[in-house]
């Protein structure tokens, strides 16, 4: 489904939170949305790989990576897991790598930056907890919508009609 965050803000400005503009699109889909699943980790992508092996239909994985620009939490092989398991998108408050390969994948990916250095794979972090970045607190099962203009959050699904 295509989402237009500008139009959604025009209609739902009183019920959405708008994430501060700091993210760039790295995936092959320009817009995505769904119910969020959260991970909090720092320079370790083990939990991300584990989560993306689960069924992701209708879901967006939202990762609080502490804003680290030193290690990439997502690479092409982990992103391929998300595609294979039908995730709608991934938002990473941190970095990605394999940028050319990511843009060929049929999934939305937003992150702060790219860097070639990979992350540890020790599965250190927390799952399904509230996380806060970009001036917004994200709760598991909230709904997030993203496109090239921005990212917005709603406690309930938004009607696209």
From Swiss-Prot:
Coiled-coil region(s): none
Molecular function via GO: endoribonuclease inhibitor activity; enzyme binding
Disulfide cysteine pairs (residue numbers): none
Gene Ontology biological process terms in this record: regulation of RNA metabolic process
Keywords: Cytoplasm
This protein's GO CC annotations: cytoplasm
Pfam families: RraA-like
InterPro entries: RraA, RraA/RraA-like, RraA/RraA-like_sf, RraA_gpbac
Cited Gene3D superfamilies: Ribonuclease E inhibitor RraA/RraA-like
Localization annotation: Cytoplasm
Main localization category: cytoplasm
Keyword Membrane: no
Family under the similarity heading: Belongs to the RraA family.
Complex formation: Homotrimer. Binds to both RNA-binding sites in the C-terminal region of Rne and to RhlB.
Primary role: Globally modulates RNA abundance by binding to RNase E (Rne) and regulating its endonucleolytic activity. Can modulate Rne action in a substrate-dependent manner by altering the composition of the degradosome. Modulates RNA-binding and helicase activities of the degradosome.
Name of the protein in question: Regulator of ribonuclease activity A
Organism: Shewanella sediminis (strain HAW-EB3)
Phylogenetic classification of the source organism: Bacteria, Pseudomonadati, Pseudomonadota, Gammaproteobacteria, Alteromonadales
């Amino acid at each position: 489904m295509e989402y237009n965050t500008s139009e959604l803000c025009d209609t739902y400005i009183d019920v959405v939170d708008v994430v501060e503009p700091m993210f760039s699109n790295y995936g092959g889909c320009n817009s995505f949305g769904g119910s969020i699943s959260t991970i909090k980790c720092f320079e370790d992508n083990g939990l991300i790989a584990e989560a993306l092996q689960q069924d992701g239909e209708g879901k967006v994985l939202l990762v609080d990576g502490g804003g680290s620009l030193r290690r990439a939490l997502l690479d092409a092989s982990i992103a391929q897991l998300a595609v294979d398991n039908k995730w709608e998108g991934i938002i990473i408050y941190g970095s990605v790598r394999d940028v050319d390969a990511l843009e060929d994948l049929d999934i939305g990916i937003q992150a702060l930056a790219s860097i070639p250095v990979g992350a540890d794979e020790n599965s250190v972090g927390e799952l399904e907890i509230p996380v806060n970045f970009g001036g917004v607190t994200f709760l598991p099962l909230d709904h997030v919508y993203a496109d090239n203009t921005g990212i917005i959050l709603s406690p309930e699904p938004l009607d696209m009609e």
